[in-house]
């Protein structure tokens, strides 16, 4: 249930701290950027974004060169609050569980991304729009964060660290424009913590998905329905 009059937590802060955590797991030191102003949630679109059939078909989404994280210059939005530690902890634990279940797939997927400063945005858009094409649930949101983390780690591995700021911006913008209302309507991040952040047992109720499978199908131009792979929460 949404909380009237409450805009929720600052999604950008949640993204930045998650990315910082994922990079620190690999021994990379990246500033979480708490001093960066938040990106205000945008009005919900009239219709869900159309799925991108292939990364090569993502010409509708112009790639952004490194350093073009325009959203980081948006002034702070009133009503956004920093998320409490429990939100960050629950999300990290959920992402780690996802990663453990698909450790081999993640290793293979990193080699398939073929990231460059001018392909990264197309890869991100194709996979994320495909991920949520069949709807939203908490499991898919966790997958979204973990995929973003993989992209950031791969960017640093390939000595393209400036891409990390861009990926953080793309994740924040997608959360604000396409996922914020769903999150608020389902109790906000506090509900996520209540449902999945204490015993961690309910995490096994997620119908997880191999992100490698999504990525592979997107890259070869297959248009898939994720309902066959990822169930509802």
UniProtKB/Swiss-Prot annotation:
Region described as Disordered: spans on this chain: 32-86
Subunit structure: Forms homodimers, and heterodimers with BAX, BAD, BAK and Bcl-X(L). Heterodimerization with BAX requires intact BH1 and BH2 motifs, and is necessary for anti-apoptotic activity. Also interacts with APAF1 and RAF-1.
Domain notes for this protein: The BH4 motif is required for anti-apoptotic activity and for interaction with RAF-1.
Organismal lineage: Eukaryota, Metazoa, Chordata, Craniata, Vertebrata
Primary location: mitochondrion
Protein name: Apoptosis regulator Bcl-2
Compartments, record wording: Mitochondrion outer membrane; Nucleus membrane; Endoplasmic reticulum membrane; Cytoplasm
GO terms for MF: BH3 domain binding; channel activity; channel inhibitor activity; DNA-binding transcription factor binding; identical protein binding; molecular adaptor activity; protease binding; protein heterodimerization activity
Segments carrying motif BH1: 130-149
Family annotation (NCBIfam families): bcl-2
Gene Ontology biological process terms from the UniProt entry: actin filament organization; axon regeneration; axonogenesis; B cell apoptotic process; B cell homeostasis; B cell lineage commitment; B cell proliferation; B cell receptor signaling pathway
Alphabetical list of SMART domains matching this protein: BCL (SM00337), BH4 (SM00265)
SUPFAM superfamilies: Bcl-2 inhibitors of programmed cell death
Record's keyword annotation contains Mitochondrion: yes
Membrane-topology annotation of the record: Single-pass membrane protein
Alphabetically ordered keywords of this record: Apoptosis, Cytoplasm, Endoplasmic reticulum, Membrane, Mitochondrion, Mitochondrion outer membrane, Nucleus, Transmembrane, Transmembrane helix
């Amino acid at each position: 249930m949404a909380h009237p009059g409450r805009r929720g937590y600052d999604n950008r802060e949640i993204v930045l701290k998650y990315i910082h955590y994922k990079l620190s797991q690999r021994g990379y030191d990246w500033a979480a950027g708490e001093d960066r102003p938040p990106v205000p949630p945008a009005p919900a679109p009239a219709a869900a974004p159309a799925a991108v059939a292939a990364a090569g078909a993502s010409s509708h989404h112009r790639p952004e060169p490194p350093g073009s994280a325009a959203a980081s210059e948006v002034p702070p939005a009133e009503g956004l609050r920093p998320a409490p530690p429990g939100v960050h902890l629950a999300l990290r634990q959920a992402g780690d569980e996802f990663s453990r279940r698909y450790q081999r797939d993640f290793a293979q997927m990193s080699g398939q991304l073929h990231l460059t400063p001018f392909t990264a945005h197309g890869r991100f858009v194709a996979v994320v729009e495909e991920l949520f094409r069949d709807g939203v649930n908490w499991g898919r949101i966790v997958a979204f964060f973990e995929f973003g983390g993989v992209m950031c780690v791969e960017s640093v591995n390939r000595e393209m660290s400036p891409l990390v700021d861009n990926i953080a911006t793309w994740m924040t913008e997608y959360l604000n424009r396409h996922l914020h209302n769903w999150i608020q309507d389902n109790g906000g991040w506090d509900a996520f913590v209540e449902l999945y952040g204490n015993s961690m047992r309910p995490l096994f109720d997620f119908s997880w998905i191999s992100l490698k499978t999504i990525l592979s199908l997107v890259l070869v131009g297959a248009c898939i329905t994720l309902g066959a792979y990822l169930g509802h929460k």
